[in-house]
Amino acid sequence: MNRNDRLIYFAIFIVVLAQLVICNYLFLGPLATLTLLPVAVLFIPLKHKSAAAMLLAFLMGLLVDWLSDGVLGLNAAALVPVAFARDFLIRLFVGEDTVVRMDPVTVNKPGWFRMIAMISVAILLFLLVYVPLDSAGERSLGFNAARIGISYAVSLLAGIALSAGVTDIVTYCI
């Protein structure tokens, strides 16, 4: 494992800890769910293929569910589709050459517009699974749609800040 991968794993560990703090101590109301985990899944090193990335995402989600006051398996179930789509999203928004060379996913190569688009799709995919599973048929479609929209906006802002931080770690600590 090279130094670059260790830095990325450390950043993912910090994101999981931050998500635990958010889940346990920061309540934004019934309409907002702040999640950082889809962005962490995008930063899993590309040497891990889809199956390994899905397993890592599942374990991250299960750890957050287990150590927070959430439903066990909820984050895990919502993160697995994000990990499944990770390679496709990186190929689509960052480029095939990044996947072939197994470079770290940072803002430096694709630019902010493509990075925000990739993070946006990952967060939306996560929320489209998470919110219906969390409501379990108890909430109306309108409430769930509002929750997805508000959670998307909040999580996207946090995800952009997080990707800037990971880019700084990878770029300046090497």
Regions found by a protein language model. Give the residues of each.
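Terminal, non-globular segments
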Residues: M1-I174
